[in-house]
A protein has these predicted regions:
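Short glycine/proline/serine/threonine-rich loop/turn segments at secondary-structure transition edges
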Residues: 113-127
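Primarily secretory-pathway and cell-envelope proteins
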Residues: 1-97, 134, 138-155
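Residue-level preference for beta-strand/loop junctions
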Residues: 43, 100, 125-127
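Intrinsically disordered, low-complexity Pro/Gly/Ser/Thr-rich segments with frequent PxxP/GP/PP motifs
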Residues: 85-115
């Protein structure tokens, strides 16, 4: 089994011209959203990488599959990354305007992965996992995602 990120893209404006400057590091806030905090057996977690400009002018931001990514971990162990098995450049430049979010939706197939897909993924067990959005410089807050029935986590 090869662990993959399955991408569902929200409409975003592609950069119409190269004269729009790239967003500065302090001009973008990255967050991670999900419609659920727990996913029953057989359901794939859905993550939204959400980028919002806080700058005063429109700017270009890379929302591509190799740039605006999600990483899932358990404790200190890295479990899965949305960019691990992405072929090609994975670049998609969008224009961000102040306060208007651009979102890229990503499904996790509940399997492990490693950068470059150097070994087959394995299904993960039910439990609590930490997820974070990352673009190489910016990181979101950590989100906890539960796999399995929520009652199974009670002592």
């Amino acid at each position: 089994m090869r662990a993959q990120a399955h991408h569902a893209h929200a409409p975003a404006r592609r950069a119409p011209a190269p004269n729009i400057p790239a967003c500065g590091r302090g001009d973008v806030v990255l967050s991670l959203v999900s419609p659920r905090s727990w996913y029953q057996r057989g359901r794939w977690p859905l993550f939204g990488v959400d980028a919002v400009s806080t700058g005063t002018r429109p700017c270009r931001f890379n929302m591509g599959s190799r740039f605006a990514t999600v990483v899932v971990s358990s404790g200190r162990t890295r479990i899965w990354g949305s960019a691990d098995c992405v072929p090609g450049a994975g670049s998609q430049s969008v224009v961000l305007s102040r306060g208007v979010p651009a979102v890229r939706w990503i499904y996790w197939d509940r399997a492990t992965s490693v950068p470059g897909c150097r070994r087959p993924g394995r299904p993960v067990h039910q439990g609590a996992y930490a997820a974070i959005a990352f673009d190489g410089q910016l990181a979101s807050q950590v989100m906890v995602v539960l796999l399995g029935h929520p009652g199974s986590y009670l002592p």
